[in-house]
């Protein structure tokens, strides 16, 4: 299959268009029949190369409060604590990384539940974790995984548009709730959603387009199993960057294809790094070389690479469900 296979993998990681027959549009771009494209995508899912295809929503613009959390856990207790963290419906990613703070997870807390810091404190107390970090986003430079490069040092342009939060209507929340699952692999996928929402296909596409215009809907795309797609190494790369240089350095780092996420985050006395980038490569040496290149080019002497050694959890959060509230009630009553 070769080149055709690569084209399909590349195109479904970008942005599935908001039109009645999106797979027909993609099939034309690849140069194959729509039916063949759909069968190939189904096979990629079955073979464990594609993790899922789904709408990707911005948790902040949905009204959720989120942060990157790090726990310092005794090695003999790591799996136990990781399993506890995994049970939280607001945790989408949870990894063991090569650092004294060895358990890193992303947490999103629904509006009107509790303060995020209180949730983290209760989680830490429950598992007797004495040392932890709450690292919030200050500035976003890049977000979006596209594993379609030979070298992580390849460059690309990045959309840096900043969106303002406006509360969602109840109808918009329902649209998010219904569409956030796996994207239907049929000729008219939006019609499947529209039937469940009891609205016309045209009306749904119009409303999804409006959500995309506001940044609430980032895109609809495939997420791959990195290792099975050949990208066996990933690291959270962190730098200590002077405040007056962080905009320039952040944009520079975000321009590398091997960087999927790049943020400025809040710091702590225990963790002074303020610029974070997730790097992916076909081996650790590729990532080390890219981090060294960035550090040398931008004269940054203080940096670290936190390689992922174990993936404990990687899922999509179910927005506007009652799962988090039930879990939180159990947490505070324990």
Curated annotation (Swiss-Prot):
Gene name of this polypeptide:
nirDL
Q: Give the function comment from the record.
A: Involved in heme d1 biosynthesis. Catalyzes the decarboxylation of siroheme into didecarboxysiroheme. Siroheme is probably decarboxylated to monodecarboxysiroheme, which is in turn decarboxylated to didecarboxysiroheme.
Swiss-Prot/TrEMBL catalytic activity: siroheme + 2 H(+) = 12,18-didecarboxysiroheme + 2 CO2
GO molecular-function annotation terms?
lyase activity
Active-site residues are 93
- Pfam families recorded: AsnC_trans_reg2, NirdL-like_HTH
Q: Which cysteines form disulfides?
A: none
Matching entries from SMART domains are given as: HTH_ASNC
The record lists the lineage as: Bacteria, Pseudomonadati, Aquificota, Aquificia, Aquificales
The species is Hydrogenobacter thermophilus (strain DSM 6534 / IAM 12695 / TK-6)
Q: Which domain of life is it from?
A: Bacteria
- What remark does the entry add? H.thermophilus possesses the fused nirDL gene but lacks the genes encoding NirG and NirH.
Task: Give the family this protein belongs to, as stated in its UniProt record.
Answer: Belongs to the Ahb/Nir family.
Q: What is its EC number?
A: 4.1.1.111
The record's top EC class is lyase
Which pathway does the database say it acts in?
Porphyrin-containing compound metabolism
The protein depicted here goes by the name Siroheme decarboxylase
Task: Tell me which UniProt keywords the record has, alphabetically.
Answer: Lyase
InterPro entries, alphabetized: AsnC_trans_reg2, HTH-Siroheme_Decarb, NirdL-like_HTH, Tscrpt_reg_AsnC-like, WH-like_DNA-bd_sf
């Amino acid at each position: 299959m070769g080149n055709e296979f690569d084209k399909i993998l590349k195109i479904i990681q970008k942005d599935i268009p908001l039109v009645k027959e999106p797979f027909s549009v993609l099939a034309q771009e690849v140069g194959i029949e729509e039916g063949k494209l759909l069968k190939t995508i189904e096979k990629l899912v079955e073979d464990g190369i594609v993790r899922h295809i789904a709408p990707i929503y911005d948790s902040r613009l949905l009204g959720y409060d989120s942060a990157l959390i790090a726990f310092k856990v005794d090695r003999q207790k790591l799996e136990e604590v990781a399993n506890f963290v995994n049970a939280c419906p607001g945790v989408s990613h949870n990894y063991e990384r090569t650092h004294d703070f060895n358990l890193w997870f992303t947490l999103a807390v629904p509006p009107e539940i509790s303060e995020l810091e209180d949730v983290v404190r209760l989680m830490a107390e429950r598992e007797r974790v004495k040392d932890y970090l709450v690292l919030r986003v200050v500035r976003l430079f890049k977000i979006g995984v596209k594993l379609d490069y030979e070298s992580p040092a390849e460059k690309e342009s990045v959309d840096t548009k900043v969106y303002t939060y406006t509360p969602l209507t109840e109808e918009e929340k329902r649209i998010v709730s219904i569409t956030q699952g796996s994207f239907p692999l049929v000729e008219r996928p939006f019609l499947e959603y529209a039937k469940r929402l009891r609205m016309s296909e045209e009306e749904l596409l119009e409303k999804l387009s409006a959500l995309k215009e506001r940044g609430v809907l980032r895109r609809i795309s495939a997420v791959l199993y990195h290792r099975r797609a050949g990208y066996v190494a990933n690291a959270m790369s962190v730098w200590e960057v002077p405040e007056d240089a962080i905009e320039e350095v952040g944009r520079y780092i975000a321009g590398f294809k091997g960087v999927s996420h790049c943020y400025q985050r809040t710091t702590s006395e225990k963790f002074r790094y303020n610029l974070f980038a997730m790097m992916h490569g076909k081996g650790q040496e590729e990532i080390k070389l890219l981090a060294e290149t960035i550090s040398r080019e931008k004269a940054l002497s203080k940096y670290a690479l936190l390689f992922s050694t174990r993936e404990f959890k990687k899922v999509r959060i179910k927005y506007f469900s009652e799962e988090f509230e039930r879990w939180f009630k159990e947490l505070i009553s324990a």
